[in-house]
């Protein structure tokens, strides 16, 4: 278990700055299958998970939802036949926070 897996999300009130690019690059080394995607000026951590069918994709979506509820931090989820796209970012700051890296790390363990 990594240190990030042991951490929990902290409430973000919107006064924090998004993660600095250098720190984000360092954190990405812990989650190499995730990409930073610019979505209309908002950076997001994104990964596409693949599954054998829709039911497996849906089961994974539910597990991500349960994790999100337990941590009080919620992603965008796109569930399709055989794949789920998970996007983590912090709405309140319009960018990526350590909470998002923590959640991406925890999401990895749900597969």
Curated annotation (Swiss-Prot):
InterPro entries cross-referenced by the UniProt entry: PCD_sf (IPR036428), Pterin-4-alpha-carb_dehyd (IPR050376), Pterin_deHydtase (IPR001533)
Protein family per UniProt: Belongs to the pterin-4-alpha-carbinolamine dehydratase family.
Entry EC no(s): 4.2.1.96
Taxonomic classification: Bacteria, Pseudomonadati, Chlorobiota, Chlorobiia, Chlorobiales
GO MF, one annotated term: 4-alpha-hydroxytetrahydrobiopterin dehydratase activity
Pfam families per UniProt: Pterin_4a
Record-level GO BP terms: tetrahydrobiopterin biosynthetic process
Catalytic activity, reaction form: (4aS,6R)-4a-hydroxy-L-erythro-5,6,7,8-tetrahydrobiopterin = (6R)-L-erythro-6,7-dihydrobiopterin + H2O
Keyword Lyase included in the entry's annotation: yes
Keyword tags: Lyase
Protein name: Putative pterin-4-alpha-carbinolamine dehydratase
């Amino acid at each position: 278990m990594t240190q990030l897996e042991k951490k929990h999300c902290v409430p973000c009130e919107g006064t924090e700055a998004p993660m600095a690019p250098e720190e984000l690059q360092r954190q990405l080394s812990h989650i190499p299958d995730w990409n930073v995607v610019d979505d209309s000026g908002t950076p997001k951590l994104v990964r596409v998970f693949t599954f054998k069918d829709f039911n497996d994709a849906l089961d994974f979506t539910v597990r991500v939802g349960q994790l999100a509820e337990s941590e009080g931090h919620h992603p965008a989820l796109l569930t399709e036949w055989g794949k789920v796209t998970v996007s983590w970012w912090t709405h309140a700051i319009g960018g990526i926070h350590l909470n998002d890296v923590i959640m991406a790390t925890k999401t990895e363990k749900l597969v």
